[in-house]
């Protein structure tokens, strides 16, 4: 089978949870029988069922008997611990699946290879590392949180060709349309946005995402001298001094 093809399908599924699955990673899963996807799923929101569960549950009644003969593709190692949901590795074993293909090992302390070990101990053939770099990019926020113990930070600025980033007295637009669309996408997926007092005083930005289903980020403002007039700005924000 074309492992990369089906793993990329997992990536596509995983992205559907962007902005809602956090702080959990983005995970998609596909169950493949004889090069045909018979089930697929993704982790839709934090606290909800994991991708593997949704994938197996999505298999049509007429294909149920094919589950044990199918290969499960998932972009992150199935969990092996009881958290908000039962361990996915246990469900995979109980389903009779004999082959699992994984993109990335899960560095989370309670998983970190334990899911793979559990599968292998129960006779399941596991292959790991398919499109590994692409998987790391997909979940760069999660991997930074877990491995480096810090948030993943996007730094955004726009400047004119002669080095200016704005006007001290009035709002001006420097970013182009493509950049603004990208920023809307980023805002729909992050928990907080940090700006300085001058940005709020001059531009008075909403700092929101225009995506209808997005969870709006917490707006943070650096204002060490407490000069910001909170009654005259658009946003409800947290002020850092």
What are the language-model segments listed below?
Residues 131-146:
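Short, structured interface segments
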Residues 10, 28, 79, 119, ...:
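Residue-level signal for inorganic ion chemistry
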Residues 144-145, 150, 154-241:
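Active-site ligand-binding patch in enzyme domains
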Residues 23-26, 152-153:
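Short, small/polar residue-rich loop motifs at catalytic or cofactor-binding pockets
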Residues 31-134, 218:
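Zn2+-dependent cytidine deaminase-like catalytic core
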Residues 27-35, 157-158:
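Short beta-strand scaffold segments in enzyme catalytic cores
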